[in-house]
Amino acid sequence: MAKHKEEKTNVMRALEQKGVPYTPHTYPHGDGEAPDGVTVAQNLGINPAQVFKTLVTKGASGGYYVFDIPVAATLDLKKAAKAVGEKSIAMLHSKELLPLTGYVHGGCSPIGMKKQFPTVFHHSALDQETIFVSAGKIGFQVELSPADLMKLVRGTAADVTAAAE
């Protein structure tokens, strides 16, 4: 009888290669359909403040930047630009995401992109014992220490979200 092999993503393999402890999690989704982050948190039974979405932007200088913020938050483009020393930044179009990062919309992770871009985490990540980020594929998340994650991607922390209304 064949053993059932647990599916691993490139993100999980990268974490193992670097010796970074993590816990894998899966959640239900439609075929090729990316649920919003709050739904992911609900499906995993965790506080949405622990689940971070990965957003990729392009600065006025032409440089690319990655921002990881809580799933219920909205990126403040002015604060984000200031955090990376740009005059302005804009969200990357979905069609540009896969060729640039190797990830699809809804499965983008700060870990294991084709090229490592400057990465900024919302400062609230540091208040959590663990955070969840995409494991590089829709339906998969990894839970790990924010300090380990920031060290791995050489990330910084700043207030880059819009004020809650």
Language-model features: locations:
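Extended, low-hydrophobicity, polar/charged segments
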Residues: 1-165
